[in-house]
């Protein structure tokens, strides 16, 4: 009362009295329930639905109106009979109808504060003798109010009641706004605020991966604040709102049809979230039925598990997911309610209208085209189901009673009756010191567990627990089935849920991506995306990112990670091996055969004249070149890689060092002949061997240094264009391997140059020509090999095969051009493998320990020397 001046109070009183008297202008007689008592509790219930057009009130609300009203009367009766709760104190009631409208409810609630106004101002009406004036029609003094139902109603009423410090407990208002104690400091409720329900609904959407949904809310605090809380929870879970619609208070059919048309404009949003009052939900479902629209509805407790909402539109509501506050049915109330009829229930002025509406009959013989109600009609299990919030109505009445009981025990310790201290209640003390601190087990609840405790938190809110229902058709009968619950976390029995199309519906802005695709989110929209395929070598780090597995790895079948690819290398059973190995084996056999022939005929003139020491070195190099095929085909390992690097260059160095020594010897001899010089130095067999070994040693030293600087090993190599294949290779580049042959190339070039210079030697030295043929052919082979080697770098099998065959062909060139003719003479023309005398002029000859140049006559024998030995005549030396 400190907030109102005395003039404001009187004005409010006048307005309230005049306004309440004017209610009859709407052709709707104001009805109420008044039962006197020591303490009186007010009650606000949506006994009638809101009217249409100019009508304030509509049809009787059978479940949320009549049942809840009777639940309060039932609870009052039980408390008045209780010997332990408020013994000696009789509770009365003053129950009013809100007609499901906040403005109408506010008008009605003015009746609750009239008594407070009267009590406050009674001192102004004192008689001259000191007595108080006698007042007629004194309103009942309200200790507290139970209600309202809709949040918009409770907010309007709470704003009024707080001015007069009248505590209020709602049994159904769930708007989050009502938790604001700075504005609603005399309000409490036995139900939780909507943000718990909004969280539960968002978790249901996330559970089914419904990320693109539409919303519809009723105008007013329940719908608007509820959907706002839902949108906040949805954003936290990356759920997008396709379209957000709101139904106004007009209750016109066209507005609901318009909402359905807007919902149909978003075909990908197959799920529609409803935060609507029950009458709005019913009209929206009816509009969907008229439009033959099919959606999956996820509805708040405004829909709950009410049959009246889906009546006549069951096929449209099939598969809906709805939430209802978790509650236990009050079985004692069932017996009480089923015992009522118009003939024994005279305290409820709306009950006769309820009876006529429920049974579609008339209790009076009126000409309204209705049959007269049979006196044997009764409420039973076939036509009655307890409304879901009956328990909360009963708990609200008992909570107020427990608070009054504790206050009475404190203020009136010596009596069970009311004392003077409670004649005029201190609403502030009642609310803060007693009501917010109550803690008792819910009456009529068979389960004595934590869920049955009734108490309020610091904001005056109840505990947040919800049941999840699914609207199903079982055996041709539609009904709600409990399929889960929410209490901080969601629990669902998915197998029990029925869907309109027999499968979980999808509600996403974009179609789900394939298992090998990632989502490319569109700017400014977390729910719409474009599916982009991952590369074959990428895995899905998450649904938005394809990650490269990296060289040598490949994604698993489910693309959740990567595994190491098996190493690929030439195996002995591969078809590619047949050619190189066959050629190498054939070459090695030929080399062994030549060596055998030479050893067997080691002291024959032909073998001696061929420079057998260099021949054996040359044959060793040729044999080693054939062995390289096996090193290149063997599985790479540090040892094999070292042998490849050492053997390839060394085999060529051995061959071409021996050939270079030979061609150099011939060139120096005949350069000396032309210049008239003395016999060249270092043409003896031992000198030639040392020169050859020296040339070979250079290559060995170079390779050894290379092996030290770059230790041999293996590496897993992957081609950019063939990421699915990992090749096991030696840890050297192909270019490095070829660079290591630079020295051999120099030897080849020098051999070729010397072979070219000695191409016109006398016929006794036609071996120089065969060396020339060898070098020319070798150059052609390697000039052809190099481009093939690099062109086939993408296929290691072809590259390795090319390398092996080229090396083997180089060996065959040496065998074919240099040794095949000699072997042919030795084996098939032994008569030519002899020393013969023939006239030759201008030859170096051996004389004692020195070499002299002389002009010989026809009868003089002048042996030709090279490598310190005589050579045969043109018939043999040319070989």
Curated annotation (Swiss-Prot):
Checking InterPro entries in the record gives: ANF_lig-bd_rcpt, GPCR_3, GPCR_3_9-Cys_dom, GPCR_3_9-Cys_sf, GPCR_3_C, GPCR_3_CS, GPCR_3_mGluR3, GPCR_3_mtglu_rcpt
* The protein, known as: Metabotropic glutamate receptor 3
Its domain of life reads: Eukaryota
Stretches assigned to the Cytoplasmic side: 600-613, 665-688, 757-769, 829-879
Q: How does it sit in the membrane?
A: Multi-pass membrane protein
- What GO molecular-function term can you cite, just one? G protein-coupled receptor activity
Which keywords label this protein?
Cell membrane, Disulfide bond, G-protein coupled receptor, Glycoprotein, Membrane, Receptor, Signal, Transducer, Transmembrane, Transmembrane helix
**Cellular component, GO annotation:** plasma membrane
Q: Does the keyword Signal apply?
A: yes
Family label: Belongs to the G-protein coupled receptor 3 family.
Localized where? Cell membrane
Gene name as annotated: GRM3
């Amino acid at each position: 009362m400190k907030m109102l001046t005395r003039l404001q109070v009187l004005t409010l009183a006048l307005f309230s009295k005049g306004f309440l008297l004017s209610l009859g202008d709407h052709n709707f007689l104001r009805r109420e329930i008044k039962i006197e008592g020591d303490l009186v509790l007010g009650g606000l219930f949506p006994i009638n639905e809101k009217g249409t057009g100019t009508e304030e009130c509509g049809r009787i609300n059978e479940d949320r109106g009549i049942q809840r009203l009777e639940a309060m009367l039932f609870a009052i009766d039980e408390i008045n009979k209780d010997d332990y709760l408020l013994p000696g104190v009789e509770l009365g009631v003053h129950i009013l109808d809100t007609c499901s409208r906040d403005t109408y409810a506010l008008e009605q609630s003015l009746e609750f504060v009239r008594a407070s106004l009267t009590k406050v101002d009674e001192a102004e009406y004192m008689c001259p003798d000191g007595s108080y004036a006698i007042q007629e029609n004194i309103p009942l003094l309200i200790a507290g109010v139970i209600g309202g139902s809709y949040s918009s109603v409770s907010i309007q009423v709470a704003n009024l009641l707080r001015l007069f410090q009248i505590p209020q407990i709602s049994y159904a208002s769930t708007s989050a706004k009502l938790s604001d104690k700075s504005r609603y400091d005399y309000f409490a409720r036995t139900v939780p605020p909507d943000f718990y329900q909004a969280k539960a609904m968002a978790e249901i959407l996330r559970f089914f991966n419904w990320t693109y949904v539409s919303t519809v809310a009723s105008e007013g605090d329940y719908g608007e604040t509820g959907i706002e809380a839902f949108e906040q929870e949805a954003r936290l879970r990356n759920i997008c709102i396709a379209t957000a619609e709101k139904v106004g208070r007009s209750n016109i059919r066209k507005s609901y049809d318009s909402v359905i048309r807007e919902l149909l404009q978003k075909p990908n949003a197959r799920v529609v979230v409803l935060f609507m009052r029950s009458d709005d939900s019913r009209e929206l479902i009816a509009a969907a039925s008229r439009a033959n629209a099919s959606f999956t509805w996820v509805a708040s407790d405004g829909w709950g598990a009410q049959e009246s909402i889906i009546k006549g539109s069951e096929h449209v509501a099939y598969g809906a997911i709805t939430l209802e506050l978790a509650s236990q049915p009050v079985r004692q109330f069932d017996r009480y309610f089923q015992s009522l009829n118009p003939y024994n229930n005279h305290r409820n002025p709306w009950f006769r209208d309820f009876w006529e509406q429920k049974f579609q009959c008339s209790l009076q013989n009126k000409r309204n085209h209705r049959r007269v109600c049979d006196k044997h009609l009764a409420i039973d299990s076939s036509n009655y189901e307890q409304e879901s919030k009956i328990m909360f109505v009963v708990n609200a009445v008992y909570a107020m009673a427990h608070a009054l009981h504790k206050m009475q025990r404190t203020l009136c310790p010596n009596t069970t009756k009311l004392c003077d201290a409670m004649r005029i209640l201190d609403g502030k003390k009642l609310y803060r010191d007693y009501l917010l601190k109550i803690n008792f087990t819910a009456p009529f609840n068979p389960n004595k567990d934590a869920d049955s405790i009734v108490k309020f938190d610091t904001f005056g809110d109840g505990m947040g627990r919800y049941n999840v229902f699914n609207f199903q058709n079982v055996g041709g009968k539609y009904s709600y089935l409990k399929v889960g619950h929410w209490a901080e976390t969601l629990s669902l029995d998915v197998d029990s849920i029925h869907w309109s199309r027999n499968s979980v519906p999808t509600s996403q802005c974009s179609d789900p991506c394939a298992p090998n695709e990632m989502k490319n989110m569109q700017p400014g929209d977390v729910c719409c995306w474009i599916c982009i395929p991952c590369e074959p070598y990428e895995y899905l780090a998450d649904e938005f990112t394809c990650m490269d597995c990296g060289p040598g790895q490949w994604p698993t079948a489910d693309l959740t990670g990567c595994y190491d690819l098996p190493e690929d290398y030439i195996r002995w059973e591969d078809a590619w091996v047949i050619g190189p190995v066959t050629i190498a084996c054939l070459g090695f056999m030929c080399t062994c055969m030549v060596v055998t022939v030479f050893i067997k005929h080691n002291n024959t003139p032909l073998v001696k004249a061929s420079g057998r020491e260099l021949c054996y070195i040359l044959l060793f190099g040729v044999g080693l070149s054939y062995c390289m095929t096996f090193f290149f085909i063997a599985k790479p390992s540090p040892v094999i890689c070292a042998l490849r690097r050492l053997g390839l260059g060394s085999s060529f160095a051995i061959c071409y060092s021996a050939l270079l020594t030979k061609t150099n010897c011939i060139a120096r001899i005949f350069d000396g002949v032309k210049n008239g010089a003395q016999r060249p130095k270092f043409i003896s067999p031992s000198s030639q061997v040392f020169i050859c070994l020296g040339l070979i040693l250079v290559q060995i030293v170079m390779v050894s240094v290379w092996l030290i600087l770059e230790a041999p090993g293996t590496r897993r190599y992957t081609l950019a264009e063939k990421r699915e294949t990992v090749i096991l290779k030696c840890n050297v580049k192909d270019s490095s391997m070829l660079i290591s042959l630079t020295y051999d190339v120099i030897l080849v070039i020098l051999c070729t140059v010397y072979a070219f210079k000695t191409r016109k030697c006398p016929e006794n030295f036609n071996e120089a020509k065969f060396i020339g043929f060898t070098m020319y052919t070798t150059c052609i082979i390697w000039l052809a090999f190099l481009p093939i080697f690099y062109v086939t770098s993408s296929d290691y099998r072809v590259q390795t095969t090319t390398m092996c065959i080229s090396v083997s062909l180089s060996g065959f060139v040496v065998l074919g051009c240099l040794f095949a003719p000699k072997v042919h003479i030795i084996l098939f023309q032994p008569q030519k493998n002899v020393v013969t005398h023939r006239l030759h002029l201008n030859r170096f000859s051996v004389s004692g320990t020195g070499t002299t140049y002389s002009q010989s006559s026809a009868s003089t024998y002048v042996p030709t020397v090279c490598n310190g030995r005589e050579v045969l005549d043109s018939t043999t030396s040319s070989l």
